[in-house]
Amino acid sequence: MSNVNEYNDIVAFHPGYYIADIIEDMEVSQAEFATRMGTTAKTLSQLINGQANISNDLAKKLSAMLGTSVEVWQNLQNAYDQKLIEIQQAKDIDAQAELVKEIDYKYFVDVVGLPKTRSINDKVANLCKFFKVADLRIMLQPDFLVNLRSSLSLNSDKNIINSRAWIQTAINISKDIETQPYNAEKLKGYLPELRGMTVKKPKEFLPRMHEIFAECGIAFVLLPHLKNSGVNGAVKWVTDDRVVLAINNRGVYADKFWFSLFHEIRHVLQQKIKKVFISSTLEEMMDINNKLEIDADKFAKNYLISPEDYRRLAPSRYTSDDEIVEFAKTIGIHPGIVAGRLQHEGIIPQERCSKLKEKYVFEIKKMNRQILGKDEI
């Protein structure tokens, strides 16, 4: 170990660096200097080479021997320690720099009001503070956010950091949403009303939806898409009686929105408190081979369109727009949900009946941690 540490333009001089100069000026050997100082040759050698720090006892001996104050040596040690911290911080920031480049910082400026900056150092500092982590690389660790359960094929740091950033953002925003203690029976009782909202416009159903979820112990967060996150929705229990349910609002068609919502509702009802569920695309949610995900998938499909009703429709590749609209009307659901189901199951081509699939536009205002709840859309 050296008694001088350098990184970029930061230089840290260990007190041993100055002691070596003093020994040279005194024209004595290290052994003699150690004897005069009242310490061992080994201790002095470690001190000179930066392998040991100045203790209060050594500072006292040096001050008496050289006619300085004790504080001189203590200050040299403190200055060195501070420089080491600066060096480590600089190294940490440089190590996080590549990770920051994978994150759309502007998203956090627009969505949660982080300060605008072009400085990588500032971006790292601002994101660490927002995510409440000492280092962004912590968010790559397998246990970050506790027992992550994902239907997503996350195989790159870019995907992992952004998916977890999106979830943590939803959790942070949810802190401003007041909820009652979680009540599963109350939530089940509201399911018919939630299903009935499928025929309404977002500006009509969202305020009531927020109220229902809050009453059931669910902080519902509708959050803009974060590039490279691949997240469509997520469920995270923050306490035993409070859960965050977050949905991505990117290019959401009615069928995908409602399938995603009821998929996540099922995860809430599963009440696996120690797990975090992440759902990606509609296709992945419906195809994943996992018991809990299969259960959520089955629940969403069957609650929106019951098996009995689906058999009654007896869909075929010749099913027309008018038939879908009429069927949807009889079961009280948005026709786009029926069309989306038929497309996904390959009964009708993707281009067929697409005009029935209404695209929702959620205008989410600039927020400071508060996502649209009671505000108008």
Task: Walk through the language-model features, giving the residues of each.
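Active-site hotspot residues in diverse enzymes, especially metal/ion-binding acidic/histidine motifs
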Residues: S2-I377
